């Protein structure tokens, strides 16, 4: 989608208007890796276009292995790169099984978020849910599930921060406009559209539950990382890389291809959590006051250290 070539960002048509997770990690990389290190490499952030002959080419994968753009890796095409970096071990293993590259040319550097886990007593008068990723990942299941929960629990509210503008694809919102309208018309839901990451993080800091009935396979999930570190109870299926991303800090249920079964599981688990919160005033803080929520491997310092070390080693080997 884009490339950091000798420290400069080379945008593509796909990336130039996007402010998604890949672009967020690209900026983390630029901000936390030494300039003298980046000047000696080309880091391609998924969907590479032009490879370079004067520096080592590193592929930084964010996409699923089955993405058609990965055709460049077929038939030993991965040999065009000096190294490949993945965002989860689950994703790495999917690529290795599909394309056959050796483990020795692969590294896993988990996504980093700037949120610092800082547990505190949250206001429990209204139990606030947040959905803060793109619509196609599960919003169509969340809305009816939440509407059913709101019939039984009158102190819950859902804030939705979602839209394809974050990728520069405003036109794709059209299919979800009826769903956005349904949210806006419900007294227990608010549709905010796409807001800055800073505004979303402020909302997470005041919220309690991230219910994510995910239907789009994730290679990692920045939204989940942000919610965990914001001291929220996160509820989601054990699908794709979500279990690895969650790092035992969440509540998971079994994935089901049938959307009705999936919605029923999400409803049942969340209803049980809300019942526990209603019956035990200490349940929420007892669950979220835990070192599990720290997610040390996902902090910016760890991310920067791993990238600096990896790129220095690759550069040294390339010069020999």
Where are these regions (language model features)?
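N-terminal pre-catalytic "stem/leader" segment of glycosyltransferase-like enzymes
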Residues: 1-51
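A charged, aromatic-enriched C-terminal amphipathic alpha-helix characteristic of glycosyltransferases
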Residues: 19-24, 264, 268, 281-318
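Donor nucleotide-sugar binding/catalytic pocket of nucleotide-sugar-dependent glycosyltransferases
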Residues: 82-96, 101-118
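Conserved donor-binding/catalytic core segment of Leloir-type glycosyltransferases
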Residues: 121-138, 143-146, 150, 159
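Nucleotide-activated donor-binding/catalytic signature segment of Leloir-type glycosyltransferases, i.e.
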Residues: 173-198
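Acidic donor-binding loop of glycosyltransferase active sites
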Residues: 205-219, 232
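Short hydrophobic beta-strand element within catalytic cores of glycosyltransferases
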Residues: 233-236, 243
């Amino acid at each position: 989608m884009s490339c950091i070539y000798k420290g400069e960002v080379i945008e593509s048509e796909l990336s130039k208007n996007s402010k998604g997770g890949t672009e967020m990690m690209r900026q983390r990389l630029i901000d936390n890796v030494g300039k003298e290190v980046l000047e000696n490499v080309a880091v391609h952030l998924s969907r590479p276009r032009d490879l370079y002959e004067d520096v080592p080419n590193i592929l930084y994968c964010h996409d699923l292995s089955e993405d058609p753009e990965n055709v460049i890796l077929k038939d030993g095409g991965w040999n065009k790169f000096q190294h490949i970096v993945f965002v989860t071990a689950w994703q790495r293993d999917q690529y290795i099984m599909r394309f056959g590259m050796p483990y020795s040319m692969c590294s896993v550097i988990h996504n980093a978020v700037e949120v610092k886990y800082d547990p505190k007593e949250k206001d429990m008068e209204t139990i606030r849910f947040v959905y803060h990723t793109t619509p196609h990942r599960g919003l169509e299941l969340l809305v009816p599930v939440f509407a059913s929960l709101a019939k039984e629990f009158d102190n819950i509210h859902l804030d939705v921060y979602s839209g394809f503008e974050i990728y520069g694809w405003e036109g794709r919102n059209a299919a979800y406009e009826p769903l956005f309208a349904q949210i806006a018309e419900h007294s227990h839901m608010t549709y905010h559209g796409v807001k800055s990451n800073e505004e979303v993080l402020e909302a997470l800091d005041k919220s309690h539950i991230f219910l994510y009935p995910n239907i789009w396979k994730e290679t990692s999930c920045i939204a989940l990382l942000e919610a965990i570190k914001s001291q929220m109870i996160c509820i989601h299926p054990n699908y794709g890389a979500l279990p690895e991303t969650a790092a035992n800090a969440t509540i998971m249920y079994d994935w089901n291809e049938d959307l009705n079964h999936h919605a029923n599981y999400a409803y049942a688990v969340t209803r049980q959590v809300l019942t526990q919160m209603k019956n035990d005033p200490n349940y929420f803080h007892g669950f979220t006051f835990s070192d599990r929520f720290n997610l040390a491997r996902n902090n910016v310092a760890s991310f920067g250290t791993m990238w600096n070390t990896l790129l220095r080693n690759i550069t040294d080997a390339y010069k020999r």
